[in-house]
Swiss-Prot record:
Record keywords, A-Z: Aminoacyl-tRNA synthetase, ATP-binding, Cytoplasm, Ligase, Metal-binding, Nucleotide-binding, Protein biosynthesis, RNA-binding, tRNA-binding, Zinc
The protein's name in its UniProt record: Threonine--tRNA ligase
Classification lineage: Bacteria, Bacillati, Bacillota, Bacilli, Lactobacillales
GO biological process: threonyl-tRNA aminoacylation
Localization of this protein: Cytoplasm
Molecular function as annotated in GO: ATP binding; catalytic activity, acting on a protein; metal ion binding; threonine-tRNA ligase activity; transferase activity; tRNA binding
Species for this entry: Lactobacillus gasseri (strain ATCC 33323 / DSM 20243 / BCRC 14619 / CIP 102991 / JCM 1131 / KCTC 3163 / NCIMB 11718 / NCTC 13722 / AM63)
Function as written in the Swiss-Prot or TrEMBL entry: Catalyzes the attachment of threonine to tRNA(Thr) in a two-step reaction: L-threonine is first activated by ATP to form Thr-AMP and then transferred to the acceptor end of tRNA(Thr). Also edits incorrectly charged L-seryl-tRNA(Thr).
Short name of any one Pfam family annotated for the protein: tRNA-synt_2b
Annotated Gene Ontology cellular component terms: cytoplasm
The encoding gene: thrS
Top-level division of the source organism's lineage: Bacteria
Amino acid sequence: MSFSVTLPDGSKKDFDKAVSVKELASSIATSLGKAAVGAKINGEMKPLDYVVDEDVEAAIITDKDEEGLNILRATAAFLLEAIAKRKYPELRLGMHEADEGGFFVDTDKEDQIKITELPELEKEMQKAIKNGEKIEYTSMKKSELEDIFKDDQFKLDLLKDEKDEVAVYKLGDFVDFGFEALLPNTGKIKNFKLLSVAGAYWLGKSSNPMLQRIFGTAFFKKAALDEDLKRRAEIKERDHRTIGRDLDLFFVDPKVGAGLPYWMPKGATIRRVVERYIVDKEVADGYEHVYTPVLMNVDAYKTSGHWAHYRDDMFPPMDMGDGEMLELRPMNCPSHIQIYKHHIRSYRELPIRIAELGMMHRYEKSGALSGLQRVREMTLNDGHTFVALDQIREEFAKVLKLIMDVYKDFDITDYYFRLSYRDPKNTDKYYANDEMWEKSQSMLKAAMDDLGLDYVEAEGEAAFYGPKLDIQTKTALGNDETMSTIQLDFMLPERFGLTYVGQDGEEHRPVMIHRGIVGTMERFIAYLTEIYKGAFPTWLAPVQAEIIPVNEEAHGAYADKVREELAKRGFRAEVDHRNEKLGYKIRESQTQKVPYTLVLGDDEMNANGVNVRRYGTEEQISKSLDDFIAEIDADVKSYSREK
């Protein structure tokens, strides 16, 4: 027997007998053998015990590699499965996964595992880690595994996709499959943490049973684990779902509709302020705001191309019984096209700018839904401008300036520009017109170059009908998210037969510019909630001033008078008339992150004044009511976020 192993640098190692991945790594360098945790053999992940006995390409994976971390986390998931099965013999196991975020294991148990039980599971896992229990890598016939798991429908479902020979791992009597590569023993899983539990439908389908998903993470070094746990704590503190619950901004009840948020009065106030701001900004910039129906004949979406390219993200059409099929709109473009088409248009009218806070519906699977960020019903800050060919660059610059002005008011500074093109290797998902794509992509690029702005280019990120400029922001949780878009569209004007009468008296085809300034209200307010950590700047805060009388009987009426004076001037204030201690009320006002807390006692009432405490400070300052009104008025007009 003789064979060669080709390494990543192109060099080869020759062998005259079979070698394990561990032995292969050691033959390259002793230090590599010690650091190795697995290998990629012909592109597939394999464990250290995997035997090589033929010509292959091999890349050794160490604990410094991202793939190495995934191997560690997969091993932690496997150990969690084994320990959970020892502790709860009746438990059934579903899917498992390890990636850059950590790992998870799906379980099915009549009495669900409580989050308070995770420390006990961790303790049992630590015992196995301390003992360095051996994890055996082998293979078994698919039929053998079907016999072992004959009473476990979850495992039988997973086995359907396996080949006749299945790689399996054993820890004592425990056996499982579906792992690419695991460590040969439990000894290296020292730095891990079980994080949380949540529900997950089997195979991601809402028609299947709901299982319990246990999340965890693991690192080779304790310092890395500590840093990750610190980051997760910060994320939890900023999570808009947590803040939304604590501040009573919104809720979602799966019993009445997953992905359909209910806006509570405070959350609705924030949304209303943002919507009014956006509408005023757009009207001042030359947009005409409209209202259009959320239902549309399905034929419009066949004409637009949504039916062919976007159907999987649309709800099923409604048969009205008379041949009419109505569809909940997934996008507003066809609606604004109808506004344009309602009149004969002249070149003198161009650009025609149409905007709407348009409600849309998109078919999202339940597993993808998340708070306000991924919902099934959303309101998009949408706009479409119809221009002549020679107006594109000027209008593009105008839209971009509007976006930058809005970013300045919300203090959005962490962003970059991305030109999103179609994927030339997968053109089936895009409108088929090579000339149009080349023309629109080059025009978009030229417009950015004219403005002297830096940008990255990304293939495969375009809309199906045209390229776009995406403005990518970093959320408070560190995720990359598209906040704003500007898209050039030559396709829809052609498909809907849009025209305008030119200076020559002939009909011409307009170009359509799609643009979204802040995306959907739902996602934007989720973004703001996390960026501000719930401490909204005064102009956005649902309650701008909390008024607390020291003694209800003595000062309650004066507190109401102060609220009325503030309300007359357009400020949002509440009076806390509850029969609670003063200190408790002040603390709760701070917990609710109200910008101003006004405490009113004898001195304040006699002087027609207020005692003011800003959120996040201990300092209390007495001043006249007029002075406070001037202060809060200047604060609201500043449109600035507290640094």
